[in-house]
Structure formats: structure tokens, C-alpha cells
Amino acid sequence: MFKEFKEFAFKGNVLDLAVAVVMGAAFNKIITSLVTYIIMPLIGLIFGTVDFAKNWSFMGIKYGLFVQSVIDFLIVAFALFLFVKLANTLMRKEEVEEEPEENIVLLTEIRDLLQQQNGTVTNETTNIFTETDDVDNKKF
């Protein structure tokens, strides 16, 4: 049972998730600090009160704190959106930059040499591997 737990706990996905949770918590503290100590005082100056979040209330309902939480959430959500978008862009570039396997390069060179020797390029020769594209569940 311990061995199974160890295999589960040390899989790459679980460790990545743990790191993401810790980084997310730290990032959330930074954004909360930015909103509380920089953005909200600036908004408070615009509306004429120094402490916008705590002074805006009606019959005990502190909607100023709610507005602060909404602004905090929007900034965190937007920053995470940008981070995920950047990560997806980098992942796509890595996928595109992958070099073809050696056997693919060799087969392409052989095809090109055969085409040069024959002197003609037909549709059948350019698609020579389409019928055998999935031999033994391996892509050529």
C-alpha cells in the first residue's frame, strides 16, 4: 500500500499540481497586496475617501470590501489568463520546432531521389505513404 501511494505521490502530474498550488497561493498574496495597498488607495483618492474599502458601507453591509475583493479577483484572473496563454504559445512553438524522426528524413530523401531519377512527379509518388500511414500503430 505504501508503494502504491509513493508511486502516486511522486508522479509528475501530482508534483506539478502541488507546485502550482503553492505558486498560486504566493501569487495571490502579491496580487492582494497590490490591490489593498496600491490600487484601492488610488480609487479612494478619486472618490474622496482615504480608505475606500472600509468606509463604503450601508447599514453594516461593507460593499467597499466586496468591491475590493472583486477587483482582486479580476486582476488574479487576468494575470492567470495571460500566464496560461503564454504557456500555451510556448508549448505550440516547442511542438512545431520538433525535428522529424530520422526514418522520416531518410524516407523523404529516398522519395525525392526516386522522383529525380524518374523525372516526373505524380500525385501517387507524393502520397506514397498515405495508405501505409498506420502500420503497426506507428506513424511514418
From Swiss-Prot:
<feature type="transmembrane region" description="Helical">
    <location>
        <begin position="30"/>
        <end position="50"/>
    </location>
</feature>
<dbReference type="GO" id="GO:0008381">
    <property type="term" value="F:mechanosensitive monoatomic ion channel activity"/>
</dbReference>
<comment type="similarity">
    <text>Belongs to the MscL family.</text>
</comment>
<dbReference type="Pfam" id="PF01741">
    <property type="entry name" value="MscL"/>
</dbReference>
<comment type="function">
    <text>Channel that opens in response to stretch forces in the membrane lipid bilayer. May participate in the regulation of osmotic pressure changes within the cell.</text>
</comment>
<feature type="transmembrane region" description="Helical">
    <location>
        <begin position="7"/>
        <end position="27"/>
    </location>
</feature>
<dbReference type="InterPro" id="IPR036019">
    <property type="entry name" value="MscL_channel"/>
</dbReference>
<keyword id="KW-0812">Transmembrane</keyword>
<feature type="transmembrane region" description="Helical">
    <location>
        <begin position="64"/>
        <end position="84"/>
    </location>
</feature>
<keyword id="KW-0406">Ion transport</keyword>
<dbReference type="InterPro" id="IPR001185">
    <property type="entry name" value="MS_channel"/>
</dbReference>
<keyword id="KW-0472">Membrane</keyword>
<dbReference type="InterPro" id="IPR019823">
    <property type="entry name" value="Mechanosensitive_channel_CS"/>
</dbReference>
<dbReference type="InterPro" id="IPR037673">
    <property type="entry name" value="MSC/AndL"/>
</dbReference>
<dbReference type="GO" id="GO:0005886">
    <property type="term" value="C:plasma membrane"/>
</dbReference>
<keyword id="KW-1133">Transmembrane helix</keyword>
<keyword id="KW-1003">Cell membrane</keyword>
<comment type="subunit">
    <text>Homopentamer.</text>
</comment>
<protein>
    <recommendedName>
        <fullName>Large-conductance mechanosensitive channel</fullName>
    </recommendedName>
</protein>
<keyword id="KW-0813">Transport</keyword>
<keyword id="KW-0407">Ion channel</keyword>
